[in-house]
Amino acid sequence: MTSFTGITAVANATNEMAMFKQAMKEVAAHPEWMSSRQIERQRWNPYSMEGGSTCAISGENFAIVASDTRMTQNDINILTRDAEKIQILNDNIILTTSGFYGDVLQLKKVLQSRLHKYRFDYRSDMSVDLCAELLSRNLYYRRFFPYYTGAILAGIDEHGKGAVFSYDPIGCIERLGYSASGAAEPMIIPFLDCQIGHVTLSEGYERPELTLDRAISLMKDSFRGAAEREISTGDKIHLVIAEAGKPVVVKFLPLRED
Amino acid sequence: MNAHDEVQRTLNPTCTGTSVIALQYKTGVVVLTDRVVSYGKMARYKNVSRQYKVNDNVLIAFGGDHADFHWLQNVIERQVLLWKRFDQDIGPKALHGYLTSLLYAKRCKMNPVWNTLVVAGVEEEEKNNKETSTPFIGVITQKGCAYQVKHIATGLGAFLLNQAVEDEWRKKGEDLSREEAEAVLRKSLELTLYHDCVADNEFEIGRVDATEGVVLGKEEKIIGDWSIAETNCQYE
Amino acid sequence: MWGETFDDFENDEGEMAMAKQNLIAEPARADFTFAKLPLGIQPVDFMKTHFAETAGKSMQFRKGTTTLAFVYEPATPADKGGIIVAVDSRASSGEYISSKSVMKILDIGDRMVATMAGGAADCQFWTRIVAKYCTLYELREKTSITVSAASKYFANTLYGYRGQGLSVGSMVAGYDKKGPQIFKVDSEGDRCQLKVCSVGSGSLNAYGILDNHYKPKMTDDEARKLGLRAIMHATYRDSGSGGVCNLCHITPTEKIRLPPMDVSKLWYEFADELGRDITYNPVE
């Protein structure tokens, strides 16, 4: 206790508070009880990247989803040539995820169980719009320990139209005409921008209509193109076609294996 | 600190096993592991089996930390007993799913089980009908990343052998016989032996067959052909 | 749990009373249980390690923006006045433009919007929480919530997560019984009322245009043009902004969302208006 004048007391108090806050911060970052083993543990990288790419295109009455089936270790070593990144959640919802495969599996499990419960509670299948919001929320719930995934949800909405929803790892949602995620995203998207978005076409030129056939060929092209230039994409195209009022069709098409 | 530092600073496993090689044949799965547990580069424990028989349908082989696998054996045993209470035998698919969740949950606590597990078995599609049973190989890495395969090599084998085993598999596919599959595995071990310094020449081949169930292998030895060493040394 | 017996129906009245009680009470602060990192790991450091530039391009969070809003009074009786909210539509993950068509004006109520700058997911999620609160408030109090109250709730919620790495820079703009109001709210818990406001990476460029041309009294056409102009110029100087310009005009009676305008086309429009050739002319 040095002085009783107000100013010094306040100054002391603020100073003390600042020091206290600093100490709190330090102790929160490095608690004393933490053993070196625990500190080591925290430096461990809980994520890995299994590579691969996924893409979805929606049209007037259809949505098609594709992914490659390669799974790599450190982007270099191919672990398996038939890892599936697409999950058909019900007749009109398809989830496709790239990124850390453990999270991909977890996300699939979370959505499957939520959809199951929805069926149990409401005795109907969930619509793709609802599921899209559900996924967004579930991604955000892991805001502070995110899923290391780029998810795309596609399907047929309540009006029979194709829908594609694109997400970032923590659940920023946007409905788009087409979307891609994963290692080859920066390659596939410009191609689709050109072919479907027609961003490079001047006004007054004819814009080809996006039919199912055209969408499928574009999808094949984009993956074959990506497999030529991207190391962790290849082996097989896993193609899922959802058309309004028709059952979901699944196809596997060959891709470069090198 | 950059991203690479933390990989290096990781809490390292102590006593480890190396590659597991497994291959599916017509009616079952063969699994090969060597019988050594290393402490760094030292061959610390010899004559240790790295395969664990869960029940008549499932066999688990591990690569990675030996202690963690022992802990896992306990957990698995409990799970098997739990199923027994409902008069069920746990199948390879179910166990694979369970272990995936377990390893993922441990990862989320940043306290990983330092194992790469290979769940080999025969999945019974219909109860007591061996005709419809299908062979199953499932792999789980320590981060909870799981997948099913027809053939697999883990550890250093993932780099050395995956393609070699795949090529053999593609020649015959589903029609591979047990003898042929075992021959492929023996050849593969020889290859790891040449290049993996913690691999051992004592090994065992376990198998899960639709009719015979799990048959744990006997200890075998391989010498290999070291004449290739002449062409592959830069240290004379 | 598994089924209802007839006895259960007798409890209905009690339950109704309970439900009413719950409805009258002020809803608790949004208490989400987010999955947490194990004790001792700082989320901010963790994100920096795994989701910053070192991560794959597609694994970075979407961000980057120019948003602006201003209040003006009608210059002539024919004009409506109110608030202009204008935003760009680019979301970038690092150097990669992960979306060029993001809607950054999010609805909170019939008469209120929030803009989105900073982490896209953070804004989307928390804006919905605020919207839910506002709707519940309206149902409970039978009057629409003031912009001030809504933004206060927003700021308080964000303050609860301060220092954990949220990234939100939002403007809550709307018309209520006190008139047109804009509140800027950010993830540090800051909240302040402004007449002219811009947030995001391109905000300084937007301010440059805005402060130059802003007048307290404007015609509707002038005001809308000003919003477009400021966004357009900001997108030309800030690489984190771009795409189309979305504009929302909140008048005393309604909320008008204008169709998106491509900023590349706007450039030519404004060049024409200035009577200037778009090619660079050093002599001039």
Curated annotation (Swiss-Prot), chain A:
GO cellular component: a single term: cytosol
Major place of residence: cytoplasm
Keyword Nucleus: yes
Keyword S-adenosyl-L-methionine among record annotations: no
Subcellular location: Cytoplasm; Nucleus
Keywords: Cytoplasm, Nucleus, Proteasome
Single GO BP term: proteasome-mediated ubiquitin-dependent protein catabolic process
Description of how the protein assembles with itself and partners: The 26S proteasome consists of a 20S proteasome core and two 19S regulatory subunits. The 20S proteasome core is composed of 28 subunits that are arranged in four stacked rings, resulting in a barrel-shaped structure. The two end rings are each formed by seven alpha subunits, and the two central rings are each formed by seven beta subunits. The catalytic chamber with the active sites is on the inside of the barrel.
Role description: Non-catalytic component of the proteasome, a multicatalytic proteinase complex which is characterized by its ability to cleave peptides with Arg, Phe, Tyr, Leu, and Glu adjacent to the leaving group at neutral or slightly basic pH. The proteasome has an ATP-dependent proteolytic activity.
UniProt family annotation: Belongs to the peptidase T1B family.
Protein's name according to its UniProt entry: Proteasome subunit beta type-1
UniProt source species: Caenorhabditis elegans
Swiss-Prot record, chain C:
Function: Component of the 20S core proteasome complex involved in the proteolytic degradation of most intracellular proteins. This complex plays numerous essential roles within the cell by associating with different regulatory particles. Associated with two 19S regulatory particles, forms the 26S proteasome and thus participates in the ATP-dependent degradation of ubiquitinated proteins.
GO terms for cellular component: cytosol; nucleus; proteasome core complex, beta-subunit complex
EC number annotated for this UniProt entry: 3.4.25.1
Keyword Nuclease on entry: no
Catalytic-site annotation from UniProt: T65
Propeptide regions on this chain: 1-64
Compartments reported by the entry: Cytoplasm; Nucleus
Annotated source species: Caenorhabditis elegans
Subunit structure: The 26S proteasome consists of a 20S proteasome core and two 19S regulatory subunits. The 20S proteasome core is composed of 28 subunits that are arranged in four stacked rings, resulting in a barrel-shaped structure. The two end rings are each formed by seven alpha subunits, and the two central rings are each formed by seven beta subunits. The catalytic chamber with the active sites is on the inside of the barrel.
Tagged with keyword Disulfide bond: no
Signal sequence residues: none
InterPro entries registered for this protein in UniProt: Ntn_hydrolases_N, Pept_T1A_subB, Proteasome_sua/b, Proteasome_suB-type
Keywords: Cytoplasm, Hydrolase, Nucleus, Protease, Proteasome, Threonine protease, Zymogen
GO BP: proteasome-mediated ubiquitin-dependent protein catabolic process
UniProt-recorded name of the protein: Proteasome subunit pbs-5
Reaction catalyzed: Cleavage of peptide bonds with very broad specificity
GO molecular function terms attached to this record: endopeptidase activity; threonine-type endopeptidase activity
Enzyme class: hydrolase
Record note on disruption phenotype: No visible phenotype. Constitutive skn-1-dependent expression of the proteasomal subunit rpt-3. Double knockout with ddi-1, sel-1, sel-9, png-1 or skn-1a results in failed expression of the proteasomal subunit rpt-3.
Superkingdom to which the source organism belongs: Eukaryota
Family as reported in the entry's similarity comment: Belongs to the peptidase T1B family.
